[in-house]
């Protein structure tokens, strides 16, 4: 069984691993400095942002922007004058709203842009971990680290600007709350960043391309600033070192050429020439193989991005390019339904549509996930689903019309903290799937990403949802306590066996979340040891998932992501590639179309191997072992976990915890990649959806993040009134005959005729009284099934669980 991400983090299973973690290097600060300069948000010399009074604000007021109106050409802005007692570098902090959710508030704001002394505006494009780790201030405001500025002595002008909207609970808007900001003098200048690759990249480049290291100071030096640097590869071997000097003048950067390096992931440590190693700034870069990953439908690899929340607007294009260069063919993303449809039928999707267009422009196929419904669409009894499933149909049709490659009908409905039931969710899935299917050239329909096999999924499948889908989906994570070498969870095998039992083994299975939990402290990236474990696990999980029959794997997650003491991203908090990024690039390029052939036989004890066809006339064996062993590989070309080719041919290879790729040419034609699975066209009877509704007082128990134990059914009295909604998602009126099929000891009496005419795109409601006889055992789940026919054809049933409370 695979653990799910929400339950594992809720359980706090990661605390035992924290003591072993190291810290990233910190930068020294001067001990003597002038007093901090604090400016109230409402003290702007020019602004078009409203000022709001609030006694909690430090000056009794603050700037408060919350507008759906597009800004004027100068943006929503506030300009301030600041008197600096001396020239130099100043750290900038602000009490304001963060652009992402934090542990202490769900309030978010637009990404800020800054301009100093009428210079160009620059977005504060920090990653989610920086914002997430901010300390609380008051209300929805946090104490934000906005980086460093170089001020001149005397008067300076500082302008904050908003030009991009953000997603709020009630819709998309331009938002900012600014109470005050503070500038603190830094002593001297220091090295602030080291990166590689060309401009507009996330420190990546292709093997064979010329590349430089770029070193950046946080200000202009008064004297020549001499720095030293060292570059080590994934295996800890030093591959480059040297010195560079930034001369006084207009420049704050210097470049140093890199030698011709093999594909891999590299760690750079740089510091002032006379500083200690503990003061070094650390950067990462990736040299990618010249062999590109497979594109189009043949690509089996995806990554979770959630770009609106995790990727600053100015980084979006470079991020998308980095994911494609890593070999991902798909991205999994989604927008908040409440923001996309703030009122019935009024859609506001342009913000998210721009993200999707950017991803597609870089060759990535979007998998769009439907979020919980807006508040206006829900009732206390329907939460988190719309009470009227026609809203689900129309919203899904709208999403499909924006041309994602696939639409996933929800995310982990089995492990939320509501009382929603699997039968209600199945009715929602049918309605949403019909909305997708009824669009021209529809995208693939993907079943909800189930967190864990169990009662919820079993009941949802009993409601015959598979016939509405092109793809079966699930998630799986290893035990969070396994920090050293996590084992791939059994979720893939469980789901394969479940699909086979249902006769649905021909439906492609996608693992739309797979990843691992790595415990971190605030302000700290993964340690080098953790980075290696993450890289190894990514390869093993992708390989074992494909070997278990998965058609596609989505890693969680691509962007930098820190959540409740756990780090998930393939990029560092500086948006630079970690070793797992390079491991993914090697995997996707070498496996190609990744046609699974079978396990590798004849290996020594402790060694594991799986064979794939690349689609290029090659056999690719992926091998690893708990302890180093020698394995014969006559006539093969060997690549390491980073994609580096072995220097010379050898009859044997040492296999260890780091996977290796053994590639040999094969005779015959490459295996053809199958066309995407498409379900048959849905019949008029399948366009009829039955949905059981019960009063809130009869709600099922709360799912408690999936930890609730049976009985899980609606809690009924001896006599309970309930309703059955009959939806007709066709374009003509339909006459439907309904029948109730209660379990033994129960009866269901219709209060209305059970033959009903349902208008096109309409709903009719039938009332029933459900009665339990004296022999019914309390607190035990029983099935209650409603069936129907349309012109003699069976309508997919609605099957619930009920219990006598």
Give the positions of each predicted feature.
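Carbohydrate-binding surface patches
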Residues: 95, 601-636, 641-642, 664
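Aromatic/acidic polysaccharide-binding cleft in carbohydrate-active enzymes
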Residues: 516, 522-584, 600-602
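Extracytoplasmic
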Residues: 29-191, 210, 290, 745-751
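Active-site cleft segment of glycoside hydrolase catalytic domains centered on the general acid/base Glu
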Residues: 377-471, 475-494, 521-539, 569-571
């Amino acid at each position: 069984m695979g653990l799910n991400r929400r339950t594992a983090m809720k359980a706090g299973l990661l605390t035992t691993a924290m003591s072993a973690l190291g810290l990233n290097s910190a930068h020294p600060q001067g001990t003597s400095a002038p007093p901090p300069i604090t400016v109230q948000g409402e003290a702007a010399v020019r602004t078009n942002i409203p000022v709001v009074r609030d006694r909690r604000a430090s000056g009794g007021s603050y700037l408060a922007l919350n507008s759906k109106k597009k800004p004027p050409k100068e943006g929503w802005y506030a300009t301030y004058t600041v008197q600096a007692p001396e020239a130099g570098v100043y750290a900038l902090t602000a009490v304001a709203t963060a652009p992402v959710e934090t542990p202490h508030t769900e309030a978010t704001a637009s990404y800020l842009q800054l301009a100093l002394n009428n210079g160009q505006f620059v977005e504060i494009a920090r990653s989610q971990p920086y914002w997430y780790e901010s300390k609380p201030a008051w209300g929805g405001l946090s104490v934000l680290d906005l980086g460093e500025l170089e001020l001149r002595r005397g008067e300076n002008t500082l302008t904050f600007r908003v030009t991009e909207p953000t997603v709020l609970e009630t819709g998309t808007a331009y938002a900012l709350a600014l109470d005050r900001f503070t500038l603190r003098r830094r002593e001297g200048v220091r090295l602030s960043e080291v990166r590689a690759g060309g401009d507009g990249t996330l420190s990546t480049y292709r093997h064979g391309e010329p590349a430089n290291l770029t070193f950046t100071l946080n200000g202009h030096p008064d004297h020549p600033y001499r720095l030293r640097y060292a570059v080590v590869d994934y295996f800890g071997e030093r591959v480059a070192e040297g010195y560079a000097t930034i001369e006084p003048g207009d420049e704050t950067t210097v470049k140093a050429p890199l030698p011709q390096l093999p594909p891999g992931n590299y760690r750079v440590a740089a510091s002032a020439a006379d500083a200690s190693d503990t003061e070094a700034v650390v950067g990462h870069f990736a040299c990618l193989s010249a062999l590109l990953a497979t594109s189009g439908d043949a690509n089996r690899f995806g990554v979770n991005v959630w770009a609106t929340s995790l990727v600053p607007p100015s980084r979006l294009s470079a991020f998308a390019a980095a994911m494609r260069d890593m070999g991902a063919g798909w991205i999994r993303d989604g927008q908040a339904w409440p923001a996309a449809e703030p009122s019935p039928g009024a859609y506001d999707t342009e913000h998210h549509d721009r993200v999707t267009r950017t991803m597609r422009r870089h060759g990535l196929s979007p998998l769009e996930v439907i979020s919980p419904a807006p508040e206006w669409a829900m009732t206390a009894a329907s939460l988190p689903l719309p009470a009227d499933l026609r809203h689900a149909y129309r919203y899904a049709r709208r999403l499909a019309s924006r041309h994602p490659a696939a639409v996933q009908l929800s995310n982990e409905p089995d492990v939320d903290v509501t009382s929603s039931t699997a039968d209600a969710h199945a009715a929602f899935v049918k309605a949403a799937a019909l909305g997708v299917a009824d669009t021209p050239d529809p995208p693939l329909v993907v079943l909800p990403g189930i967190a864990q096999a169990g009662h919820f999924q079993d009941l949802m499948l009993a409601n015959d949802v598979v016939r509405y889908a092109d793809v079966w989906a699930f998630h799986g994570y290893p035990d969070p306590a396994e920090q050293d070498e996590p084992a791939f969870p059994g979720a893939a095998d469980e789901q394969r066996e479940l699909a086979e039992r249902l006769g649905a083994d021909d439906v492609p299975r996608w693992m739309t979340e797979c990843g691992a939990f790595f415990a971190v402290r605030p302000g700290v990236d993964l340690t080098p040891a953790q980075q290696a474990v993450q890289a190894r696990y990514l390869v093993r999980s992708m390989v074992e998932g494909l070997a278990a029959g998965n058609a596609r794997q989505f890693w969680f997650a691509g962007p930098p992501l820190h959540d409740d003491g756990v780090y998930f991203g393939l990029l560092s908090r500086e948006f630079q590639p970690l070793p797992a990024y390079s491991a993914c690039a090697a995997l996707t390029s070498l496996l190609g179309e990744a046609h699974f052939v079978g396990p590798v036989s004849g290996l020594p004890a402790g060694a594991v191997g799986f064979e794939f066809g690349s689609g290029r006339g090659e056999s690719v064996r992926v091998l690893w072992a708990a302890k180093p062993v020698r394995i014969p590989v006559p006539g093969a070309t060997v690549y390491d976990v980073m994609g580096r080719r072995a220097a010379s041919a050898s009859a044997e290879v040492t296999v260890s915890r780091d996977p290796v790729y053994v590639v040999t040419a094969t005779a015959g034609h490459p295996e053809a990649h199958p066309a995407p699975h498409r379900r048959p066209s849905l019949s008029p009877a399948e366009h009829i959806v039955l949905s059981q509704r019960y009063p809130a007082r009869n709600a099922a128990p709360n799912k408690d993040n999936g930890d609730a134990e049976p009985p899980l059914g609606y809690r009924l009295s001896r006599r309970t009134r309930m309703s059955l909604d009959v939806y007709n998602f066709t374009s003509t009126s339909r006459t439907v005959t309904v029948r109730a099929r209660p379990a033994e000891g129960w009866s269901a009496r219709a209060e209305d005729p059970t033959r009903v005419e349902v208008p096109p795109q309409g709903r009719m409601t039938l009332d029933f009284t459900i009665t339990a006889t004296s022999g019914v055992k309390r607190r035990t789940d029983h099935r209650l099934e409603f069936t129907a026919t349309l012109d003699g054809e069976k309508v997919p049933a609605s099957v619930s669980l009920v219990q006598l409370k």
